[in-house]
Amino acid sequence: MEGFGEFESRPSKDKIKILKGTTTVGLVVKDAVILAADRRASAGFFVANKMVRKIVYIDDRIGMTTAGSVADLQFIYNYMKNIYHYNLISGNRPVTVKSLATYLTNILSQNKYFPYLVQILMGGYDTQPRLFNLDYLGDMTEETYVATGSGSPVAMGVLEDGYSPDLTGDQAMDLAARAVMSAIKRDSFTGTGVIVTKITKEGHVEREIYPNRKEAM
């Protein structure tokens, strides 16, 4: 059609590559959701920041891992926090992990032709532990364990070998951290250390692990 010769209905391959420079992990066990992510931010082959936080919290029992464009992620995070607190103030139905993930996937799908360049794991505990994987086109899948990003092939192998739904929360934290640490050893876009969090009905507990210095609590 005349006038639309330069229009691209899908994002370019160069833009899609932005999503791949990290490693994030999520898994569900009996009484908890575990999220883990490395701390390196890369711009191409340049290490832009060594101490980036890639796990954020919508509330004490709902968290997200973040990968992709920093500006888009900041917008999505602030937007979802506002939606969550608006629903609490309004006194509507309880805000569940699935309802938040569904709301976000609708936002991403509506903007698929000019997408937010993000890859998100959303996990939390409402009546039970839940974990959802969302991509920039608005696809959403519920997972029991998952790894995303450039280091995901390495991390997924560790999860496949060690995952069981009967793991305790602390055992699952160790497994998630080990999966990301394995990716750090083999993937140049994953680095510095790991933040790992355990989310239960009581709230979340977080640990930081670094290969070359003492673990920080």
UniProtKB/Swiss-Prot annotation:
The active site is at T22 (nucleophile). The formation of the proteasomal ATPase PAN-20S proteasome complex, via the docking of the C-termini of PAN into the intersubunit pockets in the alpha-rings, triggers opening of the gate for substrate entry. Interconversion between the open-gate and close-gate conformations leads to a dynamic regulation of the 20S proteasome proteolysis activity. Its main location: cytoplasm. It catalyses: Cleavage of peptide bonds with very broad specificity. The 20S proteasome core is composed of 14 alpha and 14 beta subunits that assemble into four stacked heptameric rings, resulting in a barrel-shaped structure. The two inner rings, each composed of seven catalytic beta subunits, are sandwiched by two outer rings, each composed of seven alpha subunits. The catalytic chamber with the active sites is on the inside of the barrel. Has a gated structure, the ends of the cylinder being occluded by the N-termini of the alpha-subunits. Is capped at one or both ends by the proteasome regulatory ATPase, PAN. GO terms for cellular component: cytoplasm; proteasome core complex, beta-subunit complex. The keyword S-adenosyl-L-methionine does not apply. Belongs to the peptidase T1B family. Keywords: Autocatalytic cleavage, Cytoplasm, Hydrolase, Protease, Proteasome, Threonine protease, Zymogen. The keyword GTP-binding does not apply. This is Proteasome subunit beta 1. The gene is psmB1. One of its GO terms (molecular function) is threonine-type endopeptidase activity. Its EC number is 3.4.25.1. Component of the proteasome core, a large protease complex with broad specificity involved in protein degradation. It is found in: Cytoplasm. It comes from the Archaea. Residues 1-21 form a propeptide. One of its GO terms (biological process) is proteasomal protein catabolic process.
